[in-house]
């Protein structure tokens, strides 16, 4: 690898030493071409694009206004810029500079020669000339006599420009993409060989994007596919490498924004970003996001990437060591799903410079797969509660000012003996750890008398790390969580001390504290259930993290979200769609799912086709995971045990996909879960009984 880079560097140095004059000529030609494109876009009579980006073109030629500059004291010596009627050589210089330009530009520049006396605007690239007042009059006459012919040329140029856009061919587009790819690849090679600075490289990259299809201002009349265009995939990879790895420092924030915006208009021109996408023309900068690898993704390297990750999970953990919670996530990354490419995200809790160097080494592993590293890590989704913010304590009823309505930071059932799923849960003695009640499972004993004692029993399920502890083997469980109720009570008591004795406010706080005490005492007298089995272990390279709780017979157990829970953003989650009616064993990549956790409530996402690999508890593990969509939040601390659900397509009701056990602690956009099929299979292996989400039918 190093030798290859060294050879390239040597060739580049020889080329620079031998071809310097030619390079200078080429740069001048490119500058001239760029100026032509900018002016043609600006005067197109058939375009209705009012985008500020096009109105304020970045090309240097757009700094011309209606007034061409005059001789000024801003000049350091007798050398100054050719301007208006004050310089005789200005006209010839401008004609020479614009000889390869369209008639439109000549017309606009020549019109400026009549605006003598308007405010000065400095132009940096005009050739300096000697002040020779004696020739000004003759030059001005020459300009005036040529105005009519120039206007005719301008009209022809506009017509030719419009015709060329209409006659653009697919072959020409692919050729332009190939040229852009070659230019960007050369830039990236120079960066990796330290031939060019990142600042200069990103400027060159931006210029290349400006020169792409210069006569096409709006969208092309074709649809370019990432799956079929290797050049487009490589271009995307290079841009993402800039944005995610090379320009991460705050010093490059401006360059990063400009490149991202240019890339956005590039994708829009190729119809990879449509008007229906989330990115709008309101002036808000586009942003990179992560997306799931769905069933419709046919990118070439997807199968190979999946094989590598599968082999990685089979490696001996004794020869591997990494930071606790570090992970590798195969995803799609880009501005929109259609414009995204395969990406490997390396999450590390302690991100260092050497990790970015590792990305440079891995850059050439796949020609069209992006790689980047972020500060992130996998952690358990149980919550270690310290305190509850006081702003959630109470709200005043505007109708009756003397009444106070308190809103606890946890779900409360209307009937304490009918607890819906997704409520908060903790052990009776826990002081910090709290999670979510996933749902209810029922043993299917059949006619076997050996298990007849379990025939009418109901069992709740949650994550083992929420309810198992070394201090107690079979702890009692409380729903709602004892941890959340106790913390909420402390907040109210502390807040009540701020009001004088006998005040209406203090009385209201103390009444709510009394209500919480009554509920806690009732829960201790009417125990919800007791943990009878649980494990957190690696079984066949997969995490088995769940526990079953034998529910007291006085409680009515149904797998329903309940009517007493807080409102959902999805208006269809009503009536029959509140009930879990089916187990989903065949998970389809890209399937839309949601969960209702005790901490974050309702969040949605999509199933990823390839598993996530992570390092935890001294072992290499893998897990199915959900990518948050459309908002970049799926899970947080306190959501452990929440069921992953989906709306059924062929009938009313919900389908059970799995149970959440972990999430990425920094960005909280991934939710790791255990499929329901694996849970039921493991329960059958341990208990020798079949389990289901519906009670066993009599007889």
From Swiss-Prot:
It comes from the Eukaryota. Residues 459-699 are annotated as: Serine protease. One of its GO terms (cellular component) is plasma membrane. Induction: Down-regulated after extracellular amino-acid addition. The active site is at residues 465, 545, 640. Changing residue 576 to P: In SSY5-15; constitutively active, confers 30% increased STP1 processing in the absence of amino acids. InterPro entries: Peptidase_S1_PA, Peptidase_S64_Ssy5. Residues 39-51 have a biased composition (Basic and acidic residues). Pfam families: Peptidase_S64. One of its GO terms (biological process) is protein autoprocessing. It is a peripheral membrane protein. Keywords: Autocatalytic cleavage, Cell membrane, Hydrolase, Membrane, Protease, Zymogen. Residues 24-38, 83-93 have a biased composition (Polar residues). It is found in: Cell membrane. The keyword Flavoprotein does not apply. Residues 1-113, 128-158 are annotated as: Disordered. The keyword Cell membrane applies. The propeptide is autoproteolytically cleaved from the catalytic domain but remains associated, forming an inactive protease complex. This processing occurs even in the absence of signaling. Residues 61-78, 97-109, 144-154 have a biased composition (Low complexity). Protease component of the SPS-sensor system, which regulates the expression of several amino acid-metabolizing enzymes and amino acid- and peptide-permeases in response to extracellular amino acid levels by controlling the activity of two transcription factors, STP1 and STP2. Catalyzes the activation of these transcription factors, which are synthesized as latent cytoplasmic precursors, by proteolytic removal of an N-terminal inhibitory domain containing cytoplasmic retention motifs. SSY5 binds as an inactive protease complex to STP1. Belongs to the peptidase S64 family. Component of the plasma membrane SPS (SSY1-PTR3-SSY5) amino acid sensor complex. This is SPS-sensor serine protease component SSY5.
């Amino acid at each position: 690898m190093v030798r290859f880079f060294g050879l390239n560097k040597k060739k580049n140095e020889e080329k620079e030493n031998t071809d310097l004059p030619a390079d200078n000529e080429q740069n001048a030609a490119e500058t001239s071409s760029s100026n032509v494109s900018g002016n043609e876009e600006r005067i197109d009579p058939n375009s209705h694009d009012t985008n500020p980006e096009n109105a304020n073109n970045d090309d240097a030629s757009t700094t011309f206004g209606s007034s061409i500059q005059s001789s000024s004291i801003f000049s350091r010596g007798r050398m100054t810029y050719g301007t208006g009627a004050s310089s005789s050589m200005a006209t010839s210089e401008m004609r020479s500079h614009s000889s390869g330009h369209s008639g439109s530009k000549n017309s606009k520049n020549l019109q400026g020669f009549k605006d003598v006396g308007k405010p000065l605007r400095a132009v940096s690239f005009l050739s300096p000339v000697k002040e020779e007042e004696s020739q000004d009059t003759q030059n001005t006459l020459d300009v005036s006599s040529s105005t009519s012919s120039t206007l005719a040329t301008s009209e022809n140029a506009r017509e030719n420009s419009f015709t060329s856009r209409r006659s653009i061919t697919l072959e020409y587009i692919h050729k332009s993409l190939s040229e852009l790819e070659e230019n960007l690849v050369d830039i990236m090679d120079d960066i990796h060989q330290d031939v060019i600075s990142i600042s200069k490289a990103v400027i060159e990259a931006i210029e290349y994007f400006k020169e792409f299809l210069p006569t096409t201002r709006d969208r092309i009349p074709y649809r370019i596919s990432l799956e079929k265009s290797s050049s487009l995939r490589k271009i995307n990879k290079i841009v993402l490498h800039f944005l995610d790895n090379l320009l991460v420092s705050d010093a490059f924030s401006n360059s990063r924004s400009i490149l991202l915006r240019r890339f956005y208009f590039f994708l829009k021109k190729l119809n990879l970003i449509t008007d229906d996408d989330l990115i709008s023309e309101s002036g808000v900068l586009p942003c990179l996001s992560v997306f799931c690898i769905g069933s419709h993704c046919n990118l070439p390297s997807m199968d190979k990437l999946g094989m590598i990750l599968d082999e990685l999970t089979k490696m001996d953990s004794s020869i591997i060591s990494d930071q606790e919670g570090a992970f590798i996530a195969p995803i799609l990354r880009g501005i929109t799903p259609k414009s995204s490419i395969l990406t490997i995200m390396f999450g590390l809790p302690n991100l260092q410079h050497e990790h970015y160097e590792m990305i440079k080494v891995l850059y050439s592993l796949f020609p069209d797969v992006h790689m980047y590293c972020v500060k992130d890590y996998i952690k358990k989704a149980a919550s270690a509660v310290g305190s509850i913010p006081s702003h959630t304590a109470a709200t005043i009823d505007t109708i009756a000012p003397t009444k106070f309505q308190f809103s606890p930071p946890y779900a409360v059932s209307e009937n304490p003996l009918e607890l819906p799923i997704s409520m908060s849960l903790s052990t009776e003695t826990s002081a910090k750890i709290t999670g979510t009640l996933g749902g209810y499972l029922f043993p299917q004993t059949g006619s076997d008398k050996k298990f007849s004692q379990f025939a009418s029993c109901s069992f709740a399920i949650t994550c083992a790390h929420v309810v198992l502890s070394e201090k107690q083997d079979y702890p009692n469980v409380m729903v709602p969580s004892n941890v959340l109720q106790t913390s909420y009570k402390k907040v109210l008591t502390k807040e009540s001390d701020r009001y004088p004795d006998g005040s209406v406010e203090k009385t209201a706080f103390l009444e709510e504290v009394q209500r919480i005490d009554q509920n806690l005492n009732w829960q201790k007298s009417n125990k919800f259930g007791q943990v009878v089995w649980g494990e957190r272990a690696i079984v066949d390279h997969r995490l088995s993290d769940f526990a079953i709780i034998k529910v007291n017979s006085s409680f009515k157990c149904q797998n329903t979200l309940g009517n007493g829970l807080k409102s959902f953003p999805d208006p269809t989650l009503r009536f029959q769609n509140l009930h879990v009616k089916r187990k989903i064993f065949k998970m389809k990549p890209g399937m839309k799912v949601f969960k209702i956790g005790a901490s974050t409530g309702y969040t949605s996402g999509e199933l990823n086709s390839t598993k996530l690999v992570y390092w935890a508890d001294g072992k290499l593990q893998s897990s199915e995971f959900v990518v948050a969509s459309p908002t970049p939040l799926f899970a947080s601390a306190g959501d452990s045990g929440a069921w992953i659900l989906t709306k059924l397509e062929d009938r009313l009701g919900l389908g059970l996909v799995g149970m959440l056990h972990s999430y990425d602690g920094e960005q909280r956009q991934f939710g790791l879960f255990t499929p329901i099929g694996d849970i039921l299979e493991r329960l059958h292996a341990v208990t020798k009984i079949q389990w289901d989400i519906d009670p066993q039918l009599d007889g």
